Amino acid sequence: MQLIPSLITQLSPWRLVRLALAAAGLPGLLSAQKIAATAANPPTPAEVVELNPFIVDASRDTGYVAAETLSGTRLKTEVRHVASPVTILTEEFLQDIGATSFADIVEFMPGTETYRFDDSDLRGEQAHNGRTFSARGFRADNQSRDFFNTGIPLDTYNTGPISLNRGPNSNLFGIGSAGGALTFGSRPGRLDRATQDLELKFDSNGSQRYVYRRNQPIVPQKLTLSFAALQEQRNGFRRPEGNDRTSVTLGAEWRPVRHTTIGLNHERGELKNLRPYQFATYDWTAPWIAAGRQLTTPVPGSSADFTPPNSASVPRAIESLGNSSFIRILGTDYPIFEYNRSFGYGRRTYLNGVLERVSVADSRLLPLETYTGGFGQVNRTSFDTTMVRVQQRLLPGLHAELAARRENTDGRDHGMLGSNEQAVYIDPNPILANGQPNPFVGQPYIESATNRVTLSEDNNEAWRFSAVYDLALPDYRIFGRRLGRVRLSAFYSEEESASFMRRLTQRVRSGGGNLRHRLYLGGQNGWYLPDGLKRDYRQVRGGVGVPSVDTVWEEGTAAGDRDARGNKTNALSFVGHALLLDERLSLIAGYREDENTSETFDPGAESRKVAKNGAMTYGAVLHLSNWLSLFGNYGENFRPAGTGRVGIDAKHLPENLGQSRDFGLRFALFERKLFGSFTYYDTKQLNQVRNSLGEIINDFDDVWDTIEYAYSTLSPATLAAARLPASPPTRPTDDATAIYSRNSAENNGNPGAIFADTLDSRSKGIELELIANPTPNWRLSWSVSQHRSTVTAARKTVMRYYAEHLPTWQRYVDPAGTIVAPLSTVFIQADMRGLRLADMLAAIANGFDETNAEIGGQRYGNREWSSNLVTRYTFREGGLKGWNVGGSARWRDKALVGYAANPATGFRNPSRPFFERGYWTMDVFVGHSRKIFRNSVTWDSNLRVRDLNHPKVWTSVAAAVDDGFTGNAYPTRRVLMASTSVELSTSFRW
């Protein structure tokens, strides 16, 4: 059994494809006498599609209703026979929502929404990659093209069918999110006719989009070539914000003989994304104004910190810079200034001195849509990808496919602003660093952080072999119905990737410090950093007539500044699909086994890990009648934890597992003009990675240090008198606390960044979908979704560590919680806090109690209910013939943003949640279609108004409680809702 896989793994995917292409000619040699007859009477496209289980026939779709899908078993299956929850977006539906990219699609599917943040990504960094969304309350970033994982964002200019699978499904993807996955195929070529189309789109944000496609048969019904090109400049509603893309796709479809299909697809392109942080800009000017506009007393050349006033009558409103900073003042001729610690800046906003980041910049100070990072937050990615597939009917009922894909990307990420630094500051310094009077004293400004460039390279190769056999069961009858048929399939795949990253920081050569860029607001400066920062430069000029300041790009040496990763996954799966009793009963079952090997070559976390997992998916559909069906499905998948982070015990984290149970019914009413489904689901995600452990590592490290310090000062006699061991307990040498102590200096004081923990969560709810074609002219789609996402377990690895070592620590604390006499002067933390060991353990236990108090409560950001409506009506006769009107509406329930505190414990109380109001938005469009140039060209035009009812408003996605004072909730994160925009598109097809 090991012989074939071992031989296969010795071949590269491209050698396999070359062998397959050579083998593709074999049927032609064996069937030479049949070729002439085939050429004389070529099969129709419908006949060929029906014989090929790897391709669906989109021509069978009606309006928004899809007839076939690959997203049940990876093979062509009628949608009504699929047991797992799947939504298929037809071409008409995509046109009516005006979708061209992933971002346009995600808000229109049931149970999904735009991703904001989650427990392992509090800053929302993953929202920028163009493929992350939230499904059933879980973060999902699985996108596959032709069932190969891809990191290139979806665009409809070169894609075919698009499907959303909700919940885990190992038949489709063994490695992925519990929320589901988005799958799409390459746009197929046509062998029967030549086609061309040209699309143009513009909007009121200044966006432009141009698409040209051509399909040209070279040998009718045998060979066709296709070409597609995209040029897009897509601006967002924030300023500045944009996603630009230039792509070219070449394709070929070759059918040398009737039962052989060879396909080739190659895409090359470049992405440029200017990605604002999604959260509102904070206001750090209000406290300074409220406190009486305090000023610093800076001393140029001094190394002393500025000590701000702070008393009951004089609130603290300014802070020392803390470190020497090189600052370039944009829009002036000033040289680069080196500000020392005696200079200051306006303090962050605090509510009652407790809550931070509760105030956003007033629109009069900074327009709402302005992004303070300006053009300094740009990502450029060049990519190329090639996919080859050979599909062959070997024998009647037996088909095989061999496919390979290669994808390479090179990225350059320019970052100048952290999400916590997205703020409007105030300048309280009466003089400049050169001692001259400061003309900007008392003025607000925005400032970039360290200028950094991250260079990355990702190379991915994958191949798979698929075999499927359709078996007709004996012609027995049960309950008067034929037994039916069975489809058996097997898939073997390998995927190997290598990624490299290094981070460069721009520093001033002479002083070695980081260079920051400051822009004072108002006047002629505009509102954000100027166009000059679009460029990467090695010298920063101070202004006209001022000598340049020499800078150098330094490569970081800390953990996370350099990284090389390797990843390889082998997967073998078997799927069976039985259609029984005259297709009244559909049974699907599959098992998949993945072996994932990941390696990390990082200065802070070099390691190798092998993860193996078996997952199954099985389900059934019972057609009670021609209009009513019942279905049930169970699915699993997993995601390797990888080597980038480890638990507090310095061991690899457990694998992330997904499990889901789905039950429901489907119906087709009114002569199949109304289709619908109702689903109840219960989805779990186990061992989700959450944030770093810096704080808890500190706490545990303090406990070990305190005990070790005490033993270093006590005599054997004292220990014996206290009935304590003669030597201290052995601290694990390879756990996080030991590594923290050893590597703190090596990792910029934050080795905790490589340590993480896990949590479990669960989402339960319902999904209702209705799709109708009431008349040949009217299309309608409506969905309602509910999900209640809760945390079921948290801090799992830390709690195990705590339970293991707590008995040892408690030996040094008596039952009353005081320090063991006579050691009360020794078992005290050897730092400025001077905490007793008992106090430390009590604080740790209190933190765990607070975590446990939240278990069972809804997760932050959860919007329990949502609904989507899309409709279009086309006039086919009369004076309005050729016109169409339609629109869409999306409603989102209130969002959970925090919890009130329990007065008795001070912990957050899940029974007292705080919510942000819900919202709804609406799009409308009017279109026209007509034939021109003697009916040889179809001309379509469309005018769309997006977010018709949306002014520029913030909505809160997180809040904190002012526990010690009012007990009220105050927003700590706000997201700006998209404002109204107008879009004009036109297309020509011939």
List each model region and its residues.
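N-terminal Sec signal peptide and the immediately downstream disordered periplasmic leader
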Residues: 2-111
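Extracytoplasmic beta-strand/coil segments of soluble accessory domains associated
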Residues: 66-79, 83-87, 97-153, 160
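Outer-membrane beta-barrel transmembrane strands
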Residues: 138, 149, 246, 313-339, ...
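Outer-membrane beta-barrel translocator/receptor signature
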Residues: 158-160, 171-248, 256-260, 384, ...
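Surface-exposed extracellular loop regions of Gram-negative outer-membrane beta-barrel proteins
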Residues: 272, 280, 494-501, 518-544, ...
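Flexible glycine-rich, low-complexity coil/linker segments exposed to the extracellular/periplasmic environment
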Residues: 290-369, 426-451, 500-565, 695-756, ...
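C-terminal beta-signal and adjacent terminal beta-strands/loops
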Residues: 684-687, 788-789, 888-902, 928-990
